Amino acid sequence: MDVIIRQARKEEASQIAELFMLAWPVDDILESNGLTYEQLHESITLIAANEETIYSYENTIVAEIDGKVAGAMCAYDGADYQRLKQPIVDVLGPDCGFAKMKETEAGEFYLDSVGVLPEYRGRGIASRIIEAQCERAATLGHKVAGL
């Protein structure tokens, strides 16, 4: 099994959304927003395809196995958190959990949602993606990365 760790692509937004949703309390999000799983997935896909969001493909590194996106993780400069989370609040509403969270701040490169498809878990894929995001943080000049 060859695992390729690389930058995500815009056309992979749907797969990225699916993987991020594996890391979230989806049932709570659906209940609090009155959405179906499909509606949430569609909304997160649009967000992942956008450049100016937390969950953007530009902030995401993926693990590819046999041409399939098997894992993903987004990470970003904490100084941009408030601005980058606004598109999510716009989609899910001001009462969503995302609106109330303050996960990071300036001075930290924040390692956010990581998801791996169930059939690929237990193979060190998440660890490799996290390592790649930490390397990305260093390349971008960050001295602190947090999860």
Task: Map each language-model feature to its residues.
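Hydrophobic adenine-recognition pocket in adenosine-nucleotide-binding enzymes
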Residues: 8, 114-116
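Conserved GNAT acetyl-CoA-binding A-motif
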Residues: 107-109, 130, 137-147
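Conserved GNAT-fold acetyl-CoA-binding loop/helix
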Residues: 25-48, 58-59, 83-85, 93-94
